[in-house]
């Protein structure tokens, strides 16, 4: 540490002591803030806050103000009860919930936390990157999540993802599905720029849909876990969400190359190949949730909205200051 000139030896000693105290105090404050942030980020569900006991159609969201999972309840103050675990992304189905939780510090690291219906921790997996997408199959047996490895937005050209699949029946974890054999345009595709994200599962816990990006284009892929294979079905489909009857896919479609609202929410009929936009006119960047066979829920502008899947009607706000919608249904 350089010592100022023009001061007496005694004054110079006091200046050094004061500087050390200030540095030490700053380090202590940083440590306390980091510890406090870690405790908040790692907060578990309150006793009695579970997915059981709620009506099957009850909506759960991530409450932005607290960072915790909340049950939407019009009779509660603020319209919700935020007593769940702290998560950056949350999804639940069957007897399982999945909480993606970012850890404080640099470089970015996170946890994938598997929970039961009482929101008690079953398994915790440390991950590099930033939480992006989370999905649980309808049975609760198979889970998938996507992390940003570099970058923090799908709108950027310089992003990379890692998508994992966990089978709770066997405990087997695929840390990154990028090595799955991919058929694109009728041929086996090999490229170093392959990225997958936005996995959604069919009812058989084997077939899945996802987005693959390669060569500057995005494609909808249909995957087979048992045969460990994937094939591209069509271009310009991101974050697919399969309808409860397995006949349609809600997805975000790029409609603009600009950074402002580049995606719109669409629905694809798998049998006919026809697609149509829903009545949401604003751009979205989310993996939509089917709340029933006719309705979609999704995050937009810091709130959770719903809209009919057939293109009729108009968007309706479900929860302000919220994201990551999911249902309590088994």
Language-model features: locations:
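Sequence signature of WD/YWTD-type beta-propeller architectures
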Residues: 2-330
